[in-house]
Amino acid sequence: IGEAAFSDCNSLESIAIPDSVTNISNHTFVSCSNLTSITIPGSVTDIGNCAFYECTNLTSITIPDSVTSIGNLAFYKCENLKDVTIPESVTDIGEYAFYGTKWLSEYPDDFVVLKNGILIAYKGKESIISIPDSVTSICNRAFAKCNSLTSVTIPDLVTSIGNSAFESCSNLTSVTIPDSVTSISYGAFQGCDNLTSVTI
């Protein structure tokens, strides 16, 4: 489905995507404010940037096992989205993909971690934290602007730290990065003005 194909279709309430579709492109359903139901088939492998941005009446989404990538802001400001199923096949989640959703705001733990070990976000206010041992990857912007954070220890299973993962954590002074980490992405610690101790 091409970019912005159904954007601003405010009367669209439901859609069933056929099995012939392999990709939901950027901005495909942006601001479809009355969309309440969508069926994504097992043929889809990628959900693009802003694909469902501000679909404010969407309440649930089941992402099939075929999907490996969810783009930046894919479900951003889907304010009534409460039930989300993300399979272990998803290995790449873009910046703020689920921000502004009930699913994220009502998530029962401070660390939002998928079954496959991807840490999407941190919602807590603690100053000293140890990331859970189950985490294998830290998502883009997972800790961005966590101004309460002063010290963080990253566990031994983590292999990658995403773009801007700790950007503008203005009070962060120390971070411990294990040998398992093979990739620290663009801007991971950008704007951490008080960072004085990094153990790698």
Can you say where each PLM-predicted feature lies in the sequence?
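Consensus positions within tandem repeat domains that build extended binding/scaffold surfaces
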Residues: 2-7, 25-30, 48-53, 71-76, ...
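Structural signature of tandem-repeat unit edges
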Residues: 9-23, 33-46, 56-69, 78-92, ...
